[in-house]
Amino acid sequence: MRNRIITVIFLCFLLFFGVRTGMNVWDSISDTEKENQPQTEALSGTDDMKLSGFNRETFDGISNLVTLNLANRNQWINLNGIFQKGMGKTGDLEKDWYLLKNGMLMYSQNKDSDEELKKYANNVVNLSQFAESYGMKFLYVELPYKVQRDGEYPTGVPDYGNRNADGIMEILLSKSVQTMDFRDIMKDKNIETEESFFRTDQHWKPETALWAAGELSKKLAQVDSEWKDYPEYRNSNNYRIEYHSNLFLGAIGKKIGSAYAGKDDFNMPIPIFENTIRYRVPRQEDSIDRTGDFETAFIESNNLKNDPFKVNTYAAYCDGDHNKEQVTNESAPNQRNILLIRDSFSCTLMPYLALYTKNITTLDLRLYKTKTVYDYIRRHPDIDTVIVAYNPSSITEEQYTFDRVVNEENN
């Protein structure tokens, strides 16, 4: 009986929004008919396909209005979310979203074959040896996964994120590659997913990225004798928090809507100590070149607008992903030059790591197709340390191939 009532309510909402959409479209048609415009034009550009009563401009206007109203779709997505929540639905295989048992949303990760994992791991081994042949240090960083333990997904939903990452880490450790695994660090420190990740998105929070940059700095002090760790840079007392409550609807939340998922707070730690940073994204169009303090260099305020379906709030840091970034911090205590092979977790990680050292260059192999990582290393012998920092959802051929350029569409 409960499900029947919910279904009836849902259908009434559908009828209401459908009628409203139809009225808006009819008003547009009526307004258009009042205008003395030519009434017939071939929509397809051929003489045998004509729509009497409308020219192309009229048709396009109505089409856009239908799209705007039907695809004023956050209403429909939220309505569907209310319905799905009322029905007790905990996931959608086609849209790839799932409600974990801890109340957070996540997608599932496919199983990579042992052969694929071995190939990707050996690619990392070869890259480490190549970097070391140029006198550079190398570090592979396994970033955390939102699902920390088995049994978090709804019954019957498989996920292989941690299994895939374990397969790569096992080989790297057997080959004596320098590694650090944030999954283990978080487990040892009892840092739970609920406090460290967004509920509606797959990424970690900026506060977690700040902490992670400090852990990475400690590890770099072990890898590179010239790197000095500065604990004050991870001390929360040296940051003010810019609070944005109930602002962020993450990528997974957008699939089911805020009525189902809710929205996350988006809080940004901003250094209160002095720093002067130049942040560049060199490209032919829409290049970025900003110099100033941390906030001026890294924070894109347009992505902090309260428009959850259209704005990617996570991209408030560095305006999201880029093929290549170059950072120079003249105030940094370390004079080291880092090459960071990154995924989207470094949108927030890299700015905090940049507080520790003078130069960081990042390459995102999903977007960087200019040359291979090997070629980049050959051309930049001034690099001190090469870091590959990936979370388990980044295990793809495109991101684990360093000696040639991989275009995803050709895979």
Functional labels for PLM-detected ranges:
Residues 1-411:
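Extracellular glycan-modifying ectodomains
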